[in-house]
Amino acid sequence: MLNSLLDFLSHGLLRFSWWQVALFALAVTHVTIIGVTVYLHRCQAHRALELHPIASHFFRLWLWMTTGMLTGQWAAIHRKHHAKCETEEDPHSPQTRGIWKVFLEGAELYRAEAKNEETMRKFGHGTPNDWLERNLYSKYPILGISMMMVIDVALFGVIGLTVWAVQMVWIPFWAAGVVNGFGHFWGYRNFNSADASTNLFPWGIVIGGEELHNNHHTFATSAKLSNKWYEFDIGWMYIRIMSAFGLAKVKKVAPTPRLNKPKTVLDQETLQAVLSNRYEVMARYGKAVKRAYRQELAHLKEIGGEKYQLMRGARKWFHKDADGLDEPQKKLLPEIFANSQKLHTYFQLRQDLAAIWDRSTASREQLLAQLQDWCHRAEQSGIKSLQEFATRLRRYA
């Protein structure tokens, strides 16, 4: 009897080797990641897709057992994060709370916000509130993770406690810590969104595609988080697979520009297309500014002197919007403009282009006139790349 008990505690029911246990842990934590990104994030918080009741309830049950998180709480906190991003009211912004606070205590910040009744009431609408949610998941949040612990120990013996511990820390570390923390602190940006969001890595596998956080904040209601040809979103791969089996229905993805022949006179269709693709437009303009800056820098390098050193130091930030520059950078702008009229033109036209969709009180006719005027000024600038950019704007449809 004692030997049987010791054998069970050593090996569990499955009698797996250490590497089989490790593979199991990686597999189940991956399912948890997919549950968070596909079900909680894209489906519930942003309504970017609809899930079949079978898929939806599987994820609800699985997340209850592996994280103890409730759908309504998670969706409400995340929606508030978008609504109050990078402000003091943001539940977990490293810009206001500090990177290490969010990275190391992300789960604590989540639990604290979950107790905020106003957040739940204002941002938690439209999430499941059926009998199971009221009488099982919400009522007994600890029961699910306790059941998971019993299952892990039954399958693997004492080592199952380690598997369970890994499951318990997986989301607090990767989602609450890495994504919420470093996803607003370090990485690359495809788009100049109004917040500090970044893409951590172009291949979104470990965190289910959530690595592409700047893409997500730019197109929050898109079911697909990858945007460039070299980016990969494994969450989107699973969504497509579920769609093929009738388990998911995509409602929205990021807009893709459609180009026709350039119009001599812009119309409302062109305006709407440019407005819908404004992030892509500004990202493309930013690349044009970078190319122009490199050309000017190469020219000054041939001449040599202090002007080159000044310009060289500004090459990493000159393409940004003026609102995103700090005071020392803004003070350098007049000197840069004095050294290059071409860069001055690029900078001014960038500000004017961004201002078109910032004018929320302007009528459609006024916005159209401003866009037409912008294209005319770019074409009259004498700068070939600006002329080509204006021609491309005229092609949006």
Locate each region found by the language model:
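A cytosolic-side transmembrane-helix exit/cap motif
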Residues: 43-44, 181-191
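Alpha-helical architecture
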Residues: 39-40, 80, 170, 182-185, ...
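Active-site-proximal inter-transmembrane loops
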Residues: 124-131, 186-212, 216-219
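Non-catalytic, topology-defining segments of multipass membrane proteins
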Residues: 1-178, 222-397
